[in-house]
């Protein structure tokens, strides 16, 4: 939906992790051409992280000084990992068992032995499969240009690189992979963009986003010059499988933002209080995290701490007595798969600016050297970025050129002008204040035939390279203030849950999650079974309480065909645990 921004002059943080197959890709007959060596040195000097991924045995390639350019090397098709800075070698998938090796050799298969794998040549492929079938062991067999490799289960170039990236602190969401052979398929599919050289096998070209016009190392040099090294690099294609859905457009089609647009650019989300801007922001946060991007939400109102319900999302509370230093937040974010909500709702307002300014400074090395977090959301941005500037804006402005920021506010006119000038796109909900609307300038003028003040509740406009009107999707995690409201406070009468069995209504109803839990503990099991078998509980929790997380749990329980008191115990345990988690997070 929105334009992607090219990596130019080292300014953008996206696609700065590059992984190369060796034979046929970097090297020709085992040698890396001098011009390509120079290009790799330039990439390394500019701050890119380089990895080599090869089917060769550990230390089986003559790299000499080139090895110093790589952050890590994946040997033996993913089975052996070398973390160069730590000088550690890992075998994450184990190794081929001795009995299988003996069986292969006993069948007359000539083997080349690695640390974790064995290999032979194509003429022995049928014998290898016969031995595997007779032996009954578990192994992975890969083929590449006349070589047959037998790997431990789970090993592949992509799987090995993913493990090594995590060990080195890098994310696959910053990765571009280069290859030529059959065994490079998982490598190209791991990252954001896959590049195949012109003489790559057809099956690899099918999954590549870019195919060079030159073969082998010349093709790699062509790609590096086109997309990284020249003065005005071309835009590098990114996989289309990572759109972040926002909602239904005017024609009923889905409106999405490309994750690359959020990582490379800066977003403003503006609208009146209660107009839905935090809901839309939450959709994007959930979508980015779900797609594997690391997200940091700076949350002064406590609206996003419910994100802790998502696997891999941590909610960290800052208050007057418990003040985790900014370096602790960065330490949490050093784990590639962890996203963080920083809840400042109980932290004294007068101390927030200093804390957030320190945090932004502390994040700089992680952003510059590991290119993460991919996306940082500053809620209630008007409190931290006033028009006259402050410590936060001073720390922040130098980082905006890299992209990957979102600013959420009901008063964009109260934001420092340098931030507004750096916005690449906006999501706008109803905005009635004239000065706030005027501050958006051309962004607001893109909306046709309607003023910002007249945007209906439940609608939003996406503005930037193109314009789209949408109705936001449902959330994975309900808006936290809505959830808390109905923990103990009664729902409107028409939303109560009315219990019955297969004969009649019981004249018992639940008006809140607490009352629902009490009913589960005391009502006849026949009533609970009646409703659970029909999916009534999950529907009410989703539509009445707006709690999609608990509704999903109840749907999964319904699939287990539980009976009698076992059903009651499972329902009570699930609902009670969820209630306690929400209550503790208030």
List the predicted regions and their residue ranges:
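P-loop NTPase catalytic phosphate-binding loop
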Residues: 240-375, 384-406, 410-414, 419-422
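Walker B catalytic acidic pair
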Residues: 22, 300, 379-380
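Conserved ATP-driven motor cores of ASCE-family P-loop NTPases powering translocation/secretion/packaging/pilus
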Residues: 400-404, 411-467
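Mg2+-dependent phosphoryl-transfer enzymes with acidic/Ser/Thr/Gly-rich catalytic loops
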Residues: 9, 13-15, 33, 158-240
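Conserved acidic, metal-coordinating active-site core of Asp-based
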Residues: 97-191, 199
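Terminal, compositionally biased segments used for targeting/anchoring and flexible tails
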Residues: 450-586
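Active-site phosphate-binding/coordination module
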Residues: 29-114
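Short, well-ordered beta-strand core segments
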Residues: 50, 73, 194-196, 211, ...
